[in-house]
Amino acid sequence: MKQFAASAAPKSLSREDIQSYGINGYLVLPNLINEDKLIPILNECMAAWHREKDEYNPKATWLKNSLLPDIHHRSSLVRCYYFDGPLVDVAQQLIGPNIKGATSQLTFKMRGNIKPFGWHQDNGYGQLEPTNAISTLTALDNADEENGCLWLIPGSHKGGQVDVSDRLSAQAKLAEKDLSIEIDNDKSAIPIPLNAGDAVVLHCHLLHRSEGNMSTTRDRRILFLRYADADAVEVYNGNQPRLGPLLRGVSRFGEVTEYERELFDG
């Protein structure tokens, strides 16, 4: 697999960056991808999106309107970025030497999609142990309050996992049960505006949400990539190993070591 060349590689975090992440539960990485690399990625993402998605339908579900999973199966440039880009360097510094990919998807709020997405933790959608997985959101557009940028509560990861297990049954998933969390006081919440090419890294327990896209002229397109310890297991699945491509280091699970190995030559 060809290496991904970003604006700076490998991506090294400062001591202050790591301390800030520990305190606040998030880290903004400005200009992680320069424009020359970003535009081809966006083009491949949009080609994949238009192959599988219709125009925004206000009567459709969030999954149908806003999410395209396994984008690394549909875009070779995303695959290179996911498997060998600067976010893997970041994951090693925040998680440890042994890293696997846990999720790749497009999370889009196209113009006209004014539906908000409530407070939640990403570990609530797929609880992993150890609880040091990170979610990364790379902005494919400029994102601000008008077009639905992320909001988060700094330091909220320290509260640990909020139990939403009653909404994780097979029946609940089929019904697309809401996993949002009621927050008594969100006055400490802050918006996280991003420029295209920036990324934000979130601890798996950090509370975050987004408002609808109120812009009539701009989309808010995000490349969402999740990384975990190579030995992370799915708590909701009898502590079976989370399957994902082994990107750095080693795993004690053979099925992780072999997972999607055929993609590394493509």
Model-derived regions: residue spans:
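Short, charged/polar surface micro-motifs in flexible loops or helix N-caps
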Residues: 87, 111-113, 142-145, 158, ...
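Non-heme Fe(II)-dependent double-stranded beta-helix
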Residues: 1-24, 29-128, 165, 247-256
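Non-heme Fe(II)/2-oxoglutarate
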Residues: 3, 43, 51-59, 199-201, ...
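Active-site glycine-rich loop that binds ribose-phosphate moieties when present
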Residues: 117-123, 138, 175, 185
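A generic structural micro-feature
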Residues: 62, 127-132, 215-219
